[in-house]
């Protein structure tokens, strides 16, 4: 599995701000989108381009445009929604597919409770977005769904990842590409990434419980 931890100075700076315990919902949303934009830049560096001719202000100009495959962004509900605008700011024409996953309390297995994929998803690059890669169970399930729908080029962007989750995904799907702002130390006894970001979904949606 191709794993890239993007250690750009801007990402390091913004990630440090995201980790603050006293961060506001507004700032968390904005920083999450900004880091996502920087990850998107890296995750799309290998897209093919072709020359095309346009009429410029001083005559015809040869420029380039992205060629070939189109893209669908796949946020995992609910926290993945907080990264969506960060991708759309750079790829406004991308189509959006949505996956909702939850753990079945009886079997402890991850199940899909919501799935809305674009009709031609099999012919698109699928870019999964989710702030946290912790145990890896949800991400493995999401990739399973996309592959079952015919997707062949699957890329994942997460803000922070735990080594345990990376290992789980790599064992199940060694052919995907993973981009993250940070590979953190690991999971604590409660399954939270350390140092991590806390509950990214709560911080994005403003549902953090106050003491």
UniProtKB/Swiss-Prot annotation:
The keyword Transferase applies. The keyword Zinc-finger does not apply. Its EC number is 2.4.2.9. 5-phospho-alpha-D-ribose 1-diphosphate binds at residues 78, 103, 130-138, 199. It comes from the Bacteria. Keywords: Allosteric enzyme, Glycosyltransferase, GTP-binding, Magnesium, Nucleotide-binding, Transferase. Allosterically activated by GTP. InterPro entries: PRibTrfase_dom, PRTase-like, Upp_B, UPRTase/APRTase, Ura_phspho_trans. GO terms for molecular function: GTP binding; magnesium ion binding; uracil phosphoribosyltransferase activity. Pathway: Pyrimidine metabolism; UMP biosynthesis via salvage pathway; UMP from uracil: step 1/1. Uracil binds at residues 193, 198-200. Its cofactor is Mg(2+). Belongs to the UPRTase family. Catalyzes the conversion of uracil and 5-phospho-alpha-D-ribose 1-diphosphate (PRPP) to UMP and diphosphate. This is Uracil phosphoribosyltransferase. It comes from Acinetobacter baumannii (strain AYE).
């Amino acid at each position: 599995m191709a794993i890239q931890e993007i250690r750009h100075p801007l990402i390091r700076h913004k990630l440090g701000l995201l980790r603050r315990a006293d961060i506001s919902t507004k700032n968390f949303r904005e920083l999450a989108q900004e880091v996502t934009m920087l990850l998107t830049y890296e995750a799309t560096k290998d897209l093919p381009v072709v020359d095309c001719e346009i009429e410029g202000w001083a005559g015809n100009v040869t420029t380039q445009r992205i060629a070939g495959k189109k893209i669908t962004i796949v946020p995992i509900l609910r926290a993945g929604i907080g990264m969506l605008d960060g991708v759309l700011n750079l790829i406004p024409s991308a189509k959006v597919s949505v996956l909702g996953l939850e753990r079945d309390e009886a079997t402890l297995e991850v199940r899909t409770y919501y799935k809305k994929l674009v009709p031609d998803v099999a012919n698109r690059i699928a870019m999964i977005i989710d702030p946290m890669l912790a145990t890896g169970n949800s991400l493995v399930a999401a990739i399973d769904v996309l592959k079952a729908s015919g997707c062949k080029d699957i890329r994942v962007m997460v803000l922070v990842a735990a080594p345990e989750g990376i290992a789980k995904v790599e064992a199940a799907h060694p052919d995907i590409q993973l981009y993250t702002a940070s590979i953190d130390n690991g999971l604590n006894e409660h399954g939270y990434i350390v140092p991590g970001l806390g509950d990214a979904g709560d911080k994005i949606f403003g549902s953090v419980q106050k003491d």
